[in-house]
Amino acid sequence: DKRFVFQKNFDYATYVDAFGDEELAFKKAFQALLNFSDHESLDLCGRRIAVSAPIDMQAAEGSKTVFAIRRVIRNGQFQPVDGPVWDPTVVTTSASYASTDPLRLTNVVNVGQIAIGSLVTGFGVGREIYVRAVDTVANTVTLSQELYGAAASQSYTFTRFKYLLDFSGFDDLAQFVIDDVEFLCNGEASGIMLAKEGLAFHLRDCFINK
């Protein structure tokens, strides 16, 4: 959990030389980037980073859940290492819904198994509706959008995809830029999970290949 900041040669290649491990080098470089390294961007030096498991970006930083100063990751590639770690986590369970409380499922059975960021599917559920919050005490799930035509009580399926870069641990991440980066998902991984809130998350000249 200790920070390691290169002041002179602040780039990914230098961190790889220091740590000898691609993923650890990226995590330590990202940690330094968000902790006043006197650099606003992290150059990946055109390198392809083999990712063995989803990278929890907030855990890599370790101390912040809010960050609102411009930072950039640029010039490289991320590619998953094939394996079951990328398989989506799927939970099917029952819950209650009322149009008077349109963004909440109540009486959710086994609510603790549902991950924030999960895609919600079921009767009356539109496209791209996700889990914003889970309350294991009240047995409720907060939704990103309201439902239309859902029954008062029914089954729902919650699918949590696995992302190369997962920023969902941040409560608010603003002015963050990913520039000239390719995400080679290879049919295994998803690309990027955004933070819960944040102004101007910018993908610039990037490719996300399924």
Q: Can you say where each PLM-predicted feature lies in the sequence?
A:
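Right-handed parallel beta-helix/beta-solenoid
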Residues: 35, 64-67, 146-148, 167-175, ...
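Small/polar beta-strand repeat architecture
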Residues: 3-14, 21, 87-101, 109-112, ...
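Feature marks extracellular polysaccharide-active and adherence modules
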Residues: 43-45, 52, 74-79, 123, ...
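Detector for repetitive beta-architecture
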Residues: 1-3, 9-12, 18-19, 23, ...
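Short glycine/acidic-rich loop motifs that flank beta-strands on beta-rich extracellular proteins
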Residues: 52-55, 82-86, 127, 186-193, ...
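Short linear interaction motifs
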Residues: 19-34, 52-56, 113-114, 183-186
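Glycine- and acidic/polar-rich repeat regions and solenoidal domains
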Residues: 23-29, 58-64, 162-168, 184, ...
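Surface-exposed loop/turn positions
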Residues: 40, 115-118
